[in-house]
């Protein structure tokens, strides 16, 4: 039995085209190019995220449209660097909690090109930063440490990277100093909870 057999009948399952399921492109082709009109209230559910599970099992958190609008406005006005249609960002944090989801919504809100990674791979992250002239990224300290441990890290081009957002766990002064030395950009410590949308 597959996961799709367990889902309610009114559930649409979109995959990369495995047997019996629609590929995203096929599903999209079945619908009009213009989105349907919708009346959305600010307190309507926008996204269900999950807590990190720091104090127990992860818990579901329903965030509203106004939660994410406020987060996006705050991020775009508090950020010392611009983010718009002429910039790029990388998302390598999981999308089930605020670190990844907040970065994704910020990218959509600001209009910047957003590169989504299925999983964190430090070498691929660095390649994307170079090739796509990435200006900002969110990483937890463990990710920053993994990037810094790449053998050729000092030879890589981070000239377009203007800010690294980090959080979710403490970072040592040694790691932070090394990261600033290598990336040569602003580091912005984030603190928030999924329950408060950041």
Regions found by a protein language model. Give the residues of each.
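Short beta-strand->loop structural element characteristic of the AMP-binding/adenylate-forming
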Residues: 1-2, 59-62, 91, 113-120, ...
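Short hydrophobic/charged patches on amphipathic alpha-helices used for structural packing
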Residues: 37, 123-126, 145, 153-155
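Conserved AMP-binding/adenylation subdomain of ANL enzymes
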Residues: 69-88, 96-136, 150
């Amino acid at each position: 039995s597959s996961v799709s057999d367990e889902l309610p009948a009114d559930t649409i399952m979109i995959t990369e085209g495995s047997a019996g399921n629609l590929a995203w492109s096929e599903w999209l082709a079945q619908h009009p190019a213009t989105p349907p009109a919708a009346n959305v209230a600010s307190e309507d559910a926008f996204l269900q995220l999950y807590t990190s599970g720091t104090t127990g099992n992860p818990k579901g958190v329903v965030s509203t449209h106004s939660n994410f609008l406020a987060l996006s406005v705050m991020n775009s006005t508090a950020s010392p660097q611009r983010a718009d249609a002429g910039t790029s960002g990388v998302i390598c944090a999981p999308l089930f909690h605020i670190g990844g989801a907040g970065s994704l919504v910020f990218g959509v809100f600001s209009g910047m090109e957003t590169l989504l990674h299925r999983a964190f791979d430090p070498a691929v992250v660095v390649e994307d930063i170079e090739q796509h002239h990435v200006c900002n990224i969110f990483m937890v300290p463990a990710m920053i440490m993994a990037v810094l441990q790449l053998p050729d890290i000092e030879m890589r081009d981070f000239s377009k990277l203007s800010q690294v957002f980090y959080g979710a766990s403490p970072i040592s002064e040694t790691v932070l100093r090394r990261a600033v030395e290598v990336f040569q950009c602003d580091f912005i410590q984030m603190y928030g909870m999924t329950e408060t949308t950041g």
